[in-house]
Regions:
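Long, compositionally biased intrinsically disordered regions
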Residues: 1, 9-12, 24-27, 154, ...
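Divalent metal-dependent catalytic cores for phosphoryl transfer on phosphate-bearing substrates
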Residues: 6-19, 24-169, 173-176, 182-186
Length: 230
C-alpha cells in the first residue's frame, strides 16, 4: 500500500482523512461480526475517498467558516464535482498501483447512487424541466462483495451522523435504520453475497459504535420533588 498517498490526504484533505479512519473502524467491526475480511475493508476505507484530494474544499468535511464553494455553482455542476471523486480516486488507484480489491472498493462505495442533496434541490427548483439523471449519478458499479457492501454502509452512516442535530440513542437508531434500509430498498446489495441477517447485524454494530463515539447515554426521567421526598 502507499503510505505517501495517505500522508498527502491527511495534509490536503484532513477532514476526509479523519472520516476515512472512522469509516475503517466501523467497517472492520461489522466485518468481524458478519464474516467479512476486517483488514481488507479497513484498508479500503482508508483509500476509498482519495479522489477528494483533487478538490477537497468541495466536500463538507474539509470546509470551515460556513463558506461553501458550491454557492457559486449550479446544482448540476455541484453534483458533477461530488460524483467525480470516485473517478478521480480510480485514476489515483491506477497511478499508484493499488491492489484491484482496493480499486473495487473505491469504485463501489457509492454504487449507482445519486448526489442526492443536489439532485433533490434541482428537482424541487425546476419541477417542470426534464432532468438527465446520469449527471447526478455515481459511475458505480453497485457492491458485488460483502466487504464492498460493508464499506458502503459504514461510509454512508458515518458521514450522515456528523449532521445529526443531537446525539441520542433514538436519533442514532433512526438514522442508521433509515440509511441502511434505504440502501437495501434501492437494490444496492442485490449483486453481493450479503444476507438480510447480515444487514441487521451491521445495523446493530453501527448503532452501538456510534453511541460509543458520541458518548450517548440512556436518559432517565428526573424524579419530581414529591417522589424525592418519599
Amino acid at each position: 500500500m502507499n503510505k505517501d498517498l495517505l500522508r498527502r490526504m491527511s495534509e490536503v484533505a484532513p477532514g476526509t482523512f479523519q472520516h476515512s479512519i472512522q469509516v475503517g473502524n466501523l467497517a472492520a467491526e461489522i466485518a468481524r461480526k458478519i464474516g467479512g475480511n476486517p483488514q481488507l475493508v479497513r484498508t479500503g476505507a482508508l483509500y476509498h475517498d482519495i479522489g477528494k484530494m483533487q478538490n477537497p474544499i468541495y466536500f463538507t468535511e474539509n470546509q470551515s467558516g460556513g463558506i461553501s464553494p458550491h454557492d457559486t455553482l449550479t446544482y448540476i455542476e455541484s453534483a458533477q464535482m461530488i460524483v467525480s471523486h470516485v473517478t478521480e480516486g480510480l485514476k489515483l488507484a491506477d497511478k499508484y498501483n493499488l491492489p484491484v480489491q482496493i480499486r473495487d472498493l473505491i469504485a463501489t462505495h457509492h454504487g449507482l447512487g445519486k448526489a442526492k442533496y443536489f439532485y433533490i434541490k434541482y428537482k424541487n427548483e425546476y419541477p417542470d424541466q426534464p432532468i438527465d439523471e446520469l449527471l447526478f449519478t455515481y459511475p458505480g458499479p453497485n457492491p458485488f462483495t460483502k466487504e464492498q457492501a460493508i464499506l458502503m454502509m459504514a461510509d454512508g452512516v458515518e458521514a450522515a451522523s456528523r449532521s445529526l442535530p443531537d446525539y441520542t440513542e433514538q436519533s442514532i437508531r433512526q438514522l442508521v435504520n433509515k440509511l441502511i434500509d434505504g440502501m437495501n430498498d434501492d437494490g444496492y446489495f442485490r449483486d453481493c453475497p450479503i444476507t438480510y441477517r447480515d444487514i441487521q447485524y451491521a445495523k446493530t454494530v453501527l448503532i452501538e459504535k456510534l453511541k460509543t463515539i458520541y458518548h450517548t447515554r440512556i436518559s432517565y426521567p428526573e424524579m419530581n420533588e414529591t417522589s424525592n421526598a418519599k
